C-alpha cells in the first residue's frame, strides 16, 4: 500500500519539524528543523537529560561568569540536540539563532558563526547545517553575509511576499514561509472561520512565493512550514520541501488516498527584477497587516521560550 507520505516523498523533500528523536526515527525524514520552542519541549523528555548535563558542564568549563555560562549552555544544548538528530537524518539540521537578536545583523552573524563552530568541533561539516534566522531586514542582511562565508541559512517567520523576495535577492539558501499561522490570522481577523485547502490563505501565500521564485529563476529553496491540517500539506505537494510535525506525518502515513502534485512551474524563466531597497522592503512588508503582526508575534513567542529554557538551565549552573 502506497501511503500519502510515500507519494509526497516522490515530489517533495519531507522534513520533520521536531526535536523528538523517536519521532524522527519513526518517519525517516530527509532533514529536521528545530526552533527555541521545539528545543524547550524536547528538553523536557527524559532521554535529553544527558545532553543538558553535557551542555552545562561545557559552559562551566568555558567561563566563570554566570551570564556567559548561560549563553554557552543554551548554544551547546541546541547543538547537542542537533547532533543527536544528525545521527538519524541523512540531510540537514536547522538550528535557530536567538530570536532576541532578530533586529541586530552583526550579533546574528556572530551567533551563527558560534553555532557553526560548535558543530564543526563535533565533526559536522557546514553542508549538514542550516542556521535559522527570522526574516527581518536585519536577519536577511545577516544571512547575505553568512551565505558568502559558506554558512547556509533558513530564513523563518516568513509571511510576506516582500520578505520572500528580499531573501531570494540576498542569495539565501532556503526560506520557511509559514502556512498555518497565516490561516490563524485570517480566522481571527475576519468573519470566515472555515477554509477549504485550496482557498487557505497560507496555502495561497506559499503557492505565490513558489511560483515567483521559479518564474524568475531564483535558486532559493521554498520549504513550507507551520501546518494546521493535512489538507494544507497535500495542497502544497510538489513544493521543494515541506517541514511537518510528527502528528501530521502520522496522518499522512495512515492515509492511502492518491496524492496529486499541485505545485510545478512550467512557464518561461524571466529576467530578475532590481533588488528591493530597504525602504521598498519596509513599505511593501508593512502594507500587509497580517505579515507585520505575525512576524512580531513569532519573534516574541520564540524569545519567551528561549527565556524559559534559560530559566531551566540557570537552575543547573
Swiss-Prot record:
Gene3D superfamilies: Aldolase class I. Transmembrane segments: none annotated. The active site is at residue 132. Pathway: Carbohydrate degradation; pentose phosphate pathway; D-glyceraldehyde 3-phosphate and beta-D-fructose 6-phosphate from D-ribose 5-phosphate and D-xylulose 5-phosphate (non-oxidative stage): step 2/3. Pfam families: TAL_FSA (PF00923). It catalyses: D-sedoheptulose 7-phosphate + D-glyceraldehyde 3-phosphate = D-erythrose 4-phosphate + beta-D-fructose 6-phosphate. Keywords: Cytoplasm, Pentose shunt, Schiff base, Transferase. One of its GO terms (biological process) is carbohydrate metabolic process. Belongs to the transaldolase family. Type 1 subfamily. This is Transaldolase. It comes from Haemophilus influenzae (strain ATCC 51907 / DSM 11121 / KW20 / Rd).
Amino acid at each position: 500500500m502506497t501511503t500519502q507520505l510515500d507519494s509526497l516523498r516522490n515530489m517533495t523533500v519531507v522534513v520533520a519539524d521536531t526535536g523528538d528523536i523517536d519521532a524522527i526515527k519513526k518517519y525517516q525524514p530527509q532533514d529536521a528543523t528545530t526552533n527555541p520552542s521545539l528545543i524547550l519541549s524536547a528538553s523536557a523528555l527524559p532521554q535529553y537529560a544527558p545532553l543538558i548535563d553535557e551542555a552545562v558542564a561545557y559552559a562551566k568549563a568555558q567561563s566563570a561568569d554566570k551570564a556567559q555560562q548561560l549563553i554557552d549552555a543554551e548554544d551547546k544544548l541546541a547543538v547537542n540536540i542537533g547532533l543527536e538528530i544528525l545521527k538519524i537524518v541523512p540531510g540537514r539540521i536547522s538550528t535557530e539563532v536567538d530570536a532576541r537578536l532578530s533586529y541586530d545583523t552583526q550579533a546574528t552573524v556572530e551567533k551563527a558563526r558560534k553555532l557553526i563552530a560548535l558543530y564543526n568541533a563535533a565533526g559536522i561539516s557546514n553542508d549538514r547545517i542550516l542556521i535559522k534566522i527570522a526574516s527581518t531586514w536585519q536577519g536577511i542582511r545577516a544571512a547575505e553575509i553568512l551565505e558568502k562565508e559558506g554558512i547556509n541559512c533558513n530564513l523563518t517567520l516568513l509571511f510576506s511576499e516582500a520578505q520572500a523576495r528580499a531573501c531570494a535577492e540576498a542569495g539565501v539558501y532556503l526560506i520557511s514561509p509559514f502556512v498555518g499561522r497565516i490561516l490563524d490570522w485570517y480566522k481571527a481577523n475576519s468573519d470566515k472561520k472555515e477554509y477549504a485547502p485550496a482557498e487557505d490563505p497560507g496555502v495561497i501565500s506559499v503557492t505565490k512565493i513558489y511560483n515567483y521564485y521559479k518564474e524568475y529563476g531564483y535558486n532559493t529553496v521554498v520549504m513550507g512550514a507551520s501546518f494546521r491540517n493535512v489538507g494544507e500539506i497535500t495542497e502544497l505537494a510538489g513544493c521543494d520541501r515541506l517541514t511537518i510535525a510528527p502528528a501530521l506525518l502520522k496522518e499522512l502515513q495512515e492515509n492511502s488516498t492518491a496524492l496529486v502534485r499541485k505545485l510545478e512551474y512550467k512557464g518561461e524563466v524571466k529576467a530578475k527584477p532590481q533588488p528591493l531597497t530597504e525602504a521598498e522592503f519596509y513599505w511593501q512588508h508593512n502594507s500587509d497587516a497580517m505579515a507585520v503582526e505575525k512576524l512580531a508575534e513569532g519573534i516574541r513567542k520564540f524569545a519567551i521560550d528561549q527565556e524559559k529554557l534559560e530559566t531551566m538551565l540557570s537552575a543547573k549552573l
